[in-house]
């Protein structure tokens, strides 16, 4: 990515989208992988991204940002730091050392499980769940269920990218979860 200013003004969402690389046929044929590493590598684009989330949540009276394993662990702690909040990791099964709750969810072929520490938050705590991308919505839905089992109020789900054709954002909204995504891509 160049440090040169764009020739035409871009809004923040277009600027962010311009820093996401599409890798065709990865990890398997037919998949268009949306790679956020160029976005993370450039300090300016990372700052613009975090500032978008900070502006959205600065007055939301939150207690925590919860990040989904693994790319939610990249932006979640930065956002929590900027908002002076705690960070809750929601991990893949078998990664958390203390007493935990688990929630399974369906994948295209099979299922997966995420876990949260049983003392991650208290009833009534206000939480935003964050990840890099919403595809089928399964991971974010499982995270929402876990937080609600602990009594948290899940204020919103947030992601950099929405892939609306995969149905995840609709599934999450239909469940009552408000969503904020910075940008979206058509296709897989």
UniProtKB/Swiss-Prot annotation:
Pathway: Purine metabolism; AMP biosynthesis via salvage pathway; AMP from adenine: step 1/1. GO terms for cellular component: cytoplasm. It comes from Paraburkholderia xenovorans (strain LB400). SUPFAM superfamilies: PRTase-like. This is Adenine phosphoribosyltransferase. GO terms for molecular function: adenine binding; adenine phosphoribosyltransferase activity; AMP binding. It holds the Pfam family Pribosyltran. PANTHER family: ADENINE PHOSPHORIBOSYLTRANSFERASE (PTHR32315:SF3). GO terms for biological process: adenine salvage; AMP salvage; purine ribonucleoside salvage. Belongs to the purine/pyrimidine phosphoribosyltransferase family. Gene3D superfamilies: 3.40.50.2020. It is found in: Cytoplasm. Homodimer. Catalyzes a salvage reaction resulting in the formation of AMP, that is energically less costly than de novo synthesis. Its EC number is 2.4.2.7.
């Amino acid at each position: 990515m160049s440090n040169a200013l764009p020739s035409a003004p871009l809004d923040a969402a277009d600027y962010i989208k311009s820093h996401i690389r599409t890798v065709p046929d990865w990890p398997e044929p037919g998949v268009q992988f949306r790679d956020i590493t160029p976005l993370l590598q450039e300090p300016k684009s990372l700052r613009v991204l975090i500032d978008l989330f900070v502006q959205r949540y600065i007055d939301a009276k939150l207690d925590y940002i919860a990040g989904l394993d693994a790319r939610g662990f990249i932006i979640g702690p930065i956002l929590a730091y900027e908002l002076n909040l705690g960070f809750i990791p929601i991990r893949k099964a078998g990664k958390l050392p203390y007493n935990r709750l688990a929630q399974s969810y369906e994948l295209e072929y099979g299922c997966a499980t995420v876990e949260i520490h049983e003392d991650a938050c208290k009833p009534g705590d206000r939480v935003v769940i964050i990840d890099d991308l919403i595809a089928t919505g399964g991971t974010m839905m499982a995270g929402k269920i876990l937080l609600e089992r602990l009594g948290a109020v899940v204020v919103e789900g947030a992601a950099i990218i929405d892939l609306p054709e995969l149905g995840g954002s609709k599934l999450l909204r239909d469940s009552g979860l408000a969503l904020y995504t910075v940008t979206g891509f058509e296709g897989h």
